[in-house]
């Protein structure tokens, strides 16, 4: 794309930007081809529900982002287009899914271990046998 146009037809400052843009488009095209080579139902069967939600959200966000870029290339301000609200809505759901994933990763309380820890931390010597924790642990070697 950028190589086909003479450098005299556009300012030289944007040549690097055009080259980077072309590489990005090629990368996106390759990724989409890879993603579309597998059927959606086949892909969803391999994923857990949370991963399915993530895939759906990323797909929707990608399509809307590409439409945003298309609008920008056509001279339309995407900030004034309904696609902006759609991207914000998708971001909201992405944050909700992230919260759910974070809750799943959060450490859980082991009630049995916690009760043993508290019980042993609050141990008091039995006044009847006069043992202290240090004396109770010592063993005689005969």
From Swiss-Prot:
Subcellular location per the Swiss-Prot or TrEMBL entry: Nucleus; Cytoplasm; Nucleus, Nucleolus
Disulphide bridges: none
UniProt key word RNA-binding: yes
Residue segments, region Required for transcriptional repression: 1-100
One Gene Ontology term, aspect cellular component: exosome (RNase complex)
Molecular function per GO: DNA binding; RNA binding
Keyword line: Cytoplasm, DNA-binding, Nucleus, RNA-binding, rRNA processing
Region (Disordered): 120-142
GO term, biological process aspect, one: regulation of gene expression
Subunit text: Monomer and homodimer. Associates with the RNA exosome complex.
Job of this protein: Plays a role in the recruitment of the exosome to pre-rRNA to mediate the 3'-5' end processing of the 5.8S rRNA.
Family: Belongs to the C1D family.
Record protein name field: Nuclear nucleic acid-binding protein C1D
Upper classification of the organism: Eukaryota, Metazoa, Chordata, Craniata, Vertebrata
Gene name in the database record: C1D
């Amino acid at each position: 794309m950028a190589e086909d146009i003479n450098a005299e037809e556009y300012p030289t400052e944007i040549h690097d930007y055009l080259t980077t843009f072309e590489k990005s488009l090629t990368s996106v095209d390759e990724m989409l081809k890879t993603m579309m080579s597998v059927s959606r139902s086949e892909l969803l069967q391999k994923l857990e529900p949370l991963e399915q939600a993530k895939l759906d959200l990323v797909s929707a966000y990608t399509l809307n982002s590409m439409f945003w870029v298309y609008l920008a290339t056509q001279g339309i301000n995407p900030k004034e287009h309904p696609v902006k609200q759609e991207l914000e809505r998708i971001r909201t759901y992405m944050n909700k899914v992230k919260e759910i994933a974070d809750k799943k990763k959060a450490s859980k309380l082991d009630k049995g271990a916690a009760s043993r820890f508290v019980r042993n931390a609050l141990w008091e010597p039995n006044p009847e046998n006069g043992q202290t924790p240090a004396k109770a642990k010592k063993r005689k070697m005969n």
